[in-house]
Amino acid sequence: MTPTRAQLAAFVDHTLLKPEATAADVAALVTEAAELGVYAVCVSPPMVPAAVQAGAGVRVASVAGFPSGKHVSAVKAHEAALAVASGAAEIDMVIDVGAALAGDLDGVRADIAAVRGAVGGAVLKVIVESSALLALADEHTLVRVCRAAEDAGADFVKTSTGFHPSGGASVRAVALMAEAVGGRLGVKASGGIRTAADALAMLDAGATRLGLSGTRAVLDGLG
């Protein structure tokens, strides 16, 4: 059954992570988010105060180690903690994809655990860059990384930053990730979801949250 506009909006993190974003852009994002009825907005750590100050009762998410994941774990943890202290209720962190490809799952777990320990009760989503793992390794690697995220205390696994050259979310990746975590964690599909059909396909594959930058266009596409 096709969700209503309001039902689809409730899955959405309305996202603005472009480096050129200003405080005014973030305020406009929050206003639009309130109008559309989305679940949350997602902004970079320096923009969290602007999102909170914009008010409207909109939940705020932020990121850590974004977009490369090539940060010392302590730096990711501190960045995440600062975002939470500024008012973020959720953190989307990026793993070290190179460590995952090298089979260093202990390192991946430790990296995630460092951020988990720094954010208290905030929701922690772990970005695994699923397209990169599938292109440069295999399905088993993606599954193992998702299970490592679960072991380390993640609340969600997330497909993509949307900035990696390998691409964004895919139905195949979402289905694999949903199977890997078996309903114990949420699955966020993000990156390249531009139409209502894209969004519905991700939900059908097992996504429980959607990261969208063109939210209005997606919702309008429901007809």
Curated annotation (Swiss-Prot):
Q: What EC numbers are recorded for this enzyme? A: 4.1.2.4
Record GO terms (molecular function):
deoxyribose-phosphate aldolase activity
Q: Where does this protein act, in terms of pathway?
A: Carbohydrate degradation; 2-deoxy-D-ribose 1-phosphate degradation; D-glyceraldehyde 3-phosphate and acetaldehyde from 2-deoxy-alpha-D-ribose 1-phosphate: step 2/2
Locate the active site: D92, K158, K188
Which Gene Ontology BP terms does the record give?
A: 2-deoxyribose 1-phosphate catabolic process; carbohydrate catabolic process; deoxyribonucleotide catabolic process
GO CC annotations, alphabetized: cytoplasm
Database matches in Pfam families: DeoC
Question: Could you say which protein family the record assigns here?
Answer: Belongs to the DeoC/FbaB aldolase family. DeoC type 1 subfamily.
What the entry lists under PANTHER family is as follows: DEOXYRIBOSE-PHOSPHATE ALDOLASE
The protein's name is Deoxyribose-phosphate aldolase
This protein's species is Mycobacterium avium (strain 104)
Encoding gene per record = deoC
